[in-house]
């Protein structure tokens, strides 16, 4: 709570992201303090413990007039109830498809869509460093096959879409622009677009027409399609 006090003093945002993803419960199951807390609070298991802790932190933020964002992992299973100031960020399409999205909507939680297929711009265009063909994507994949593209008309609980570029797995500064551009243009088009999108060929033509402008602004513009990348593209 001391940390949240400091965060709230520093950042006026209505939303505070509290994480909650990739918390394997093996160590929790063996931890005497965790087992003691589970027993004391009459919780079912370690996942329920995470929900309980998440609820305490979200409630604390609620007292400050803030909303708490959690990664979708916290609602893979039902358990200890979360308060009504919670927003779920759905990310793990690769591991759990739309489980977090469905569970969030079922519990009436607003959702931010930002799946690792195809909004994680650290994922390469072509296979690289253990990223197999299944974990690559190009401009066309984003535009036509992005599971995060859920128009708000589909469900009023969908707040919108996010994108990320994680740099913890070998992505260097020199790679960043070419990972971001032009794929982020397809994401931007989906984020602000309403109604039926134009066909991909028309969109692709517009992207190519803007490449020189981006380069004149100092950005490195990567290949748009996998077939344009060649075998040495990073």
Language model regions located:
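Substrate-binding groove of N-acetylhexosamine-processing glycoside hydrolases
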Residues: 1-15, 22, 36-234
């Amino acid at each position: 709570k001391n940390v949240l006090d400091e965060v709230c003093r520093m950042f006026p945002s209505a939303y505070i992201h509290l994480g909650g993803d990739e918390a394997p419960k093996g160590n929790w199951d063996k931890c005497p303090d965790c087992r003691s807390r589970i027993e004391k609070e009459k919780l079912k298991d370690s996942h329920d413990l995470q929900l309980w802790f998440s609820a305490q932190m979200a409630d604390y933020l609620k007292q400050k007039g803030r909303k708490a964002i959690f990664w979708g992992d916290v609602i893979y299973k039902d358990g200890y109830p979360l308060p009504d100031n919670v927003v779920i960020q759905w990310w793990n399409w690769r591991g759990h498809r739309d489980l977090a999205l469905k569970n969030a909507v079922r519990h009436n939680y607003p959702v931010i869509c930002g799946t690792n297929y195809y909004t994680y711009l650290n994922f390469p265009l072509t296979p690289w460093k253990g990223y197999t063909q299944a974990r690559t994507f190009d401009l066309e994949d984003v535009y036509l096959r992005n599971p995060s593209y859920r128009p708000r008309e589909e469900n009023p609980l969908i707040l919108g879409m996010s994108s990320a570029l994680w740099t913890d797995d070998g992505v260097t500064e020199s790679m960043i622009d070419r990972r971001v551009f032009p794929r982020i243009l397809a994401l931007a088009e989906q984020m602000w677009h309403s109604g039926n999108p134009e066909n991909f060929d028309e969109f692709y033509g517009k992207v190519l027409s803007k490449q020189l402008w981006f380069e004149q602004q100092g950005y490195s513009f990567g290949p748009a399609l996998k077939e344009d990348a060649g075998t040495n593209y990073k």
